[in-house]
Structure formats: structure tokens, C-alpha cells
């Protein structure tokens, strides 16, 4: 029986599911046990990650000009990152991060490895392979954001505006999922999907995601 894009996306997402032990920080935030300074550093790092990812997704959209389904996927991702960039300052302000500190902040290498690799994908990966890898990674990210948004309200007293950045990623993304499915299906039918490369890209994204959270837990 011929595999569908939906089956492939589900399979690879399951294969690349995070080991809960790889992220020690989100459980601490969920319990209200993470120091507020760690939340501030999270905000500072995301102030660098989000615009970088947006530009990377725009580059992937440009490189997908011959693949309209992949183009639509990466364009939608870039639009989402633009919204996230608008919402992020409220979270940073709630963490006590002032503009002067944000401007002078030196980012942590372990936190910036993820966006650096997304930028590498933007320049080197076949667009359809990148769709598959990125979609698998977003499943874990969305779960983390849902947990953090709830914890910020419950344990840290943050209001809706301060949590809106995480709410954006925590909610269902059915339209994006359908767009990813169409992009992968088109690549399957055209014979241009390299599952081995997509899996390798996905594993590296998951590893850099885990490194991001481990670095935040011990920023020094």
C-alpha cells in the first residue's frame, strides 16, 4: 500500500518524539520552581531566535518557488514568527527585561545552536525535506509552550498579554498541519522527498532543541 504524507508525518513525528528527560527545565517551570531570572534569559534568547527563524523561513519560501505547497508552508511559518515577534516584548517586560539589557545581552551558544541550524537548513536542505523535519519538531515545541503558558499564569502571576507569545504556539495549528501535509504529499508524488535526509534533519533539530532547554537550566 502506498504511504501517504499524513502517515509519514505521523511516523516521523513519533520517531523523533522527545524523551521527557531531555528537557529538565519545562517541568520546573510547570511546578513553579524555576527562578524568574531563568524566565528572563528565556525571553532574551527568544528575542534573538524568533527574528532569525522568520528570516530562515522566508528564505526557504523563496527557495520553494517551484514547489507552491512548500512555499505556502514556509510563508505561513514566517507569518507566525512575525506575530510571535510582536507578542514577545510583553513576556520580556513581565520578566523584568528592559530594553537596555536586551540590547547589551550576549546570547548563549547552546541556545542559539537551534536557530543557527534552521538557518543552515534554509540554505542547504531541499524544501520538502525541511518541511518534514520542521513539522516533526514543532509537535514538541507546541507542547512545551502550552505547559509554560499555564504555569506562567498559575505560578508566576503573568497576565494574558505576557503569556500571548506562548499561547500562539500552544494552540492547535490545523491549517499549518494541512499545509505541511500537502507539501509532503506533493514531494512524495514527484519523487523528490529524501526521507533519510529529512529524518537526519529532524534528529538534529530535536537535539538542538534539547540543548536549548538544558542550556537555559544552567546558563552559566
Predicted features along the sequence, with ranges:
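Active-site-proximal alpha-helical scaffolds that flank and shape metal-associated catalytic sites
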Residues: 6, 69-171, 207-210
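Acidic, carboxylate-rich catalytic segments that either coordinate divalent cations
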Residues: 192-220
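Alpha-helical bundle segments that constitute or directly flank the non-heme di-iron/ferroxidase center
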Residues: 10-21, 29-64, 129-147, 206-213
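Transmembrane alpha-helical segments of integral membrane proteins
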Residues: 178-187
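Acidic, low-complexity proline/glycine-rich segments
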Residues: 1-26, 105-109, 174-178
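A non-catalytic, amphipathic alpha-helix used as a structural packing/dimerization or gating element
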Residues: 41, 45-48, 52, 76, ...
Amino acid at each position: 500500500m502506498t504511504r501517504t504524507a499524513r502517515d509519514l508525518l505521523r511516523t516521523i513525528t513519533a520517531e523523533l518524539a522527545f524523551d521527557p528527560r531531555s528537557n529538565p527545565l519545562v517541568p520546573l517551570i510547570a511546578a513553579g520552581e524555576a527562578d524568574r531570572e531563568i524566565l528572563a534569559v528565556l525571553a532574551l534568547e527568544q528575542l534573538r531566535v524568533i527574528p532569525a527563524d522568520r528570516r530562515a523561513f522566508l528564505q526557504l519560501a523563496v527557495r520553494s518557488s517551484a514547489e507552491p505547497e512548500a512555499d505556502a508552508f514556509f510563508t505561513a511559518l514566517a507569518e507566525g514568527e512575525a506575530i510571535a515577534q510582536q507578542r514577545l516584548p510583553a513576556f520580556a517586560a513581565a520578566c523584568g527585561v528592559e530594553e537596555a539589557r536586551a540590547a547589551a545581552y550576549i546570547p548563549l551558544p547552546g541556545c542559539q545552536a537551534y536557530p543557527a541550524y534552521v538557518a543552515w537548513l534554509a540554505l542547504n536542505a531541499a524544501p520538502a525535506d525541511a518541511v518534514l523535519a520542521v513539522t516533526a519538531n514543532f509537535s514538541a515545541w507546541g507542547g512545551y509552550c502550552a505547559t509554560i503558558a499555564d504555569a506562567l499564569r498559575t505560578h508566576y502571576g503573568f497576565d494574558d498579554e505576557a503569556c500571548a507569545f506562548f499561547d500562539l504556539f500552544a494552540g492547535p495549528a490545523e491549517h499549518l498541519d494541512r499545509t505541511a501535509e500537502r507539501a509532503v504529499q506533493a514531494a512524495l508524488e514527484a519523487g523528490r522527498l529524501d526521507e533519510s535526509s529529512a529524518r537526519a534533519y529532524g534528529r538534529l533539530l530535536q537535539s538542538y532543541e534539547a540543548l536549548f532547554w538544558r542550556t537555559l537550566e544552567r546558563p552559566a
